[in-house]
């Protein structure tokens, strides 16, 4: 898994991601999962229409870039992209890239939060693809995205449909201005939800 800090320089973020993906492959990883919306900073902390310019089609520039890297390294990659489906319709989409660089499948985030610092409903339309696992050379992946983890039926549907492992690209964090005790309670609750899957 690659989880890294990102800045406003998207090309620099992508180069850093590619370097970290290479490190994972050098250590023997056959499957590498990137964090939610990994090409940029997590922009959903603000409602700003101009940020919709970050969206891209799938297939598109990111699937081409990461597809070439997956093929070069012989790994399966799970991406998390800001998808422009058509004018005015955007999704938070996980894309699975197979070892040959092709798109094995994608999943559009179904459960969209609208909480302080997570104003995703401003940007994303809920997914419309159901809970269909994606067949890959490393197994059948039940790919969901971040907030979906709080809805157990998503994991249940993926498992019932044949998923061998569940994957959640995630950008969720804590409120670091909260007291340390409260941060621990929140972290423990999140971990308990994950174990419940």
Regions found by a protein language model. Give the residues of each.
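Short beta-strand segments enriched in small/hydrophobic residues
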Residues: 1-7
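Active-site beta-strand/loop signature of hydrolases that rely on acidic residues for catalysis
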Residues: 13, 24-50, 70, 77-78, ...
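Short, glycine/charged-enriched secondary-structure capping and boundary segments
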Residues: 14-15, 46-49, 92-93, 110, ...
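Active-site-proximal loop/turn and secondary-structure-junction residues that shape catalytic pockets
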Residues: 38-39, 83, 111-113, 171-173
């Amino acid at each position: 898994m690659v989880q890294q800090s990102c800045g406003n320089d998207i090309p620099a973020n992508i180069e850093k991601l590619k370097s970290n993906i290479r490190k994972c492959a050098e250590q023997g990883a056959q499957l590498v999962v990137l964090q939610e919306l990994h090409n940029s900073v997590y922009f959903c902390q603000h409602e700003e229409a101009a940020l919709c310019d970050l969206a891209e089609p799938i297939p598109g520039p990111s699937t081409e870039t990461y597809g070439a890297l997956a093929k070069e390294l012989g790994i399966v990659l799970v991406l998390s992209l800001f998808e422009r489906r058509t004018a005015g319709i955007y999704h938070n989409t996980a894309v699975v890239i197979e070892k040959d660089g092709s798109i094995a499948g994608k999943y559009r985030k179904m459960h969209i939060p609208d909480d302080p610092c997570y104003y995703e409903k401003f940007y994303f339309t809920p997914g419309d693809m159901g809970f269909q696992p994606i067949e890959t050379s490393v197994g059948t992946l039940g790919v969901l995205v971040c907030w979906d983890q709080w809805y157990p039926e998503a994991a249940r549907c993926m498992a019932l449909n044949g998923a061998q492992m569940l994957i959640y690209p995630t950008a969720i964090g804590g409120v670091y201005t909260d007291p340390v005790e409260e941060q621990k309670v929140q972290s423990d609750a999140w971990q308990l939800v994950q174990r419940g899957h």
